[in-house]
Amino acid sequence: MGVTAFLFMRDIKTMKIAVVGSGISGLSAAWQLARSGHEVSLYEAGDYFGGHTNTVDITVDGKTFGVDTGFLVFNHRTYPNLVRLFDDIKVNTSASDMSFSCKLPLSDQPGARMLEWAGANLNTVFAQRRNLFNPRFLRMIRDILRFNRETTQMAQSDRAMDDMPLGDFLARRQYSTEFRDWYLLPMAGCIWSCPTEQMLAFPLATFVRFCQNHGLIQVSNRPQWYTVTGGARHYVVQLLKEITNKYLKTPVKSISRVDLGAQRQVKVESAMGSLMYDQVVLACHSDQSLALLSDASAEEKKILSAVGYQPNHAVLHTDASCLPARKQAWSAWNYESAGTQEPRVCVHYLLNMLQPLPCKTPVIVSLNPLSEPDPASVMGRFDYAHPVFDSAAIAAQQALPGIQGQRNTWFAGAWTGYGFHEDGLKSGLAVAEGFSIRAPWRSAGMAVGAS
């Protein structure tokens, strides 16, 4: 029984619904369902609610304040539902900075000279003045302009884009290795938090659409970015107010669908024992969802196993030695590489530029740092995982509607879109719409799928 059949056949009485996972997808689904009168139970295996929304308190320069270590920024153009949600629950936001820098060796040879540049303006692009006369660096800039021009034309064309891997497109169009290794792959690796080599398998059409929507291939008319004032946990607190039954440090052990004659229920097993629900929403990574289903169907196995994940380790610290040597190149996002053979993406988020912090000391979140920060500067360590988007993942996204609502089971997560906060929110709201529950702002004519 698919989504449409479920909508017409289900009993409209109040239901007991389990939501597994408290990231933006689970929170938004649980918030909507609870506000509509359903008896919702929110399960979270970790020691805080929020998933990738993880605000922690630190003390720097004698002041204690919250900083975000996961979800950090959004914009009004490509996060329309998140903007409306923040308006609805009265969350304050502040303007942010999305500048980008690169620091990497010019070759894989030991002792190779380092290249440093940043994209804020001409002064930072040529932070190393010798690059004004470096043919390889100028070739990169020329190819950036060509790529922006060609992909903009592709995005605006009525013709369907070829969905070849990004790496094949770069080779076919003879883009330089400097453009690929010094700009495009570092930028893309930072955005999706995955190794640059994995980005070469990214479907071209998906990549171009994303870059076009986010203003990444435009010189002008780029969106202004924002951050939640005081930390993104403020929106988590607001959403949790609507959810009565919420269980922290309560990992779900297994989920099974149980036929009770003419009625089907869902059995959720956790440290609280075995509890029966009318419906379950699995708002976690697809591989985690599959591991929980003790009786997964062949189609569920096919879809949920198709998406890979990249583990990433984040370190919160104040050791500025990881940033570019030239302070003028310091940016909000600072990519660092040890060479083309480096298997991980390393990016240093300078939180002072991303969030309005009350301190002058640099506060940094380093994702997969190449060298350990000074131990005395470390204030926290966190592990995250980000979906890897290849052709198999895109196919799984397209097939997902076919299993939504079947066997009283729903799936949500940022993995259903581009992997960002808006995608997670949209998936949670879409599940609620499966129960005929619309987001409050839908009355203004905005579809959940708007982007």
Language model feature labels by segment:
Residues 56-82:
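N-terminal glycine-rich dinucleotide-binding loop that anchors FAD/FMN and/or NAD(P) in oxidoreductases
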Residues 16-42:
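N-terminal Rossmann-like FAD-binding beta1-loop-alpha1 element of flavoenzymes
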Residues 36, 251-386:
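Mid-domain catalytic core of redox enzymes
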Residues 76-204:
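Mobile amphipathic helical/loop "lid" adjacent to a hydrophobic cofactor/ligand pocket
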Residues 57, 118-120, 342-451:
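Conserved flavin/dinucleotide-binding core of flavoenzymes
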Residues 209-266, 270:
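Helical element adjacent to the flavin cofactor pocket in flavoenzyme catalytic cores
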Residues 34-57:
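Glycine-rich FAD pyrophosphate-binding loop
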Residues 25, 48, 287:
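Conserved Rossmann-like nucleotide-cofactor binding loop
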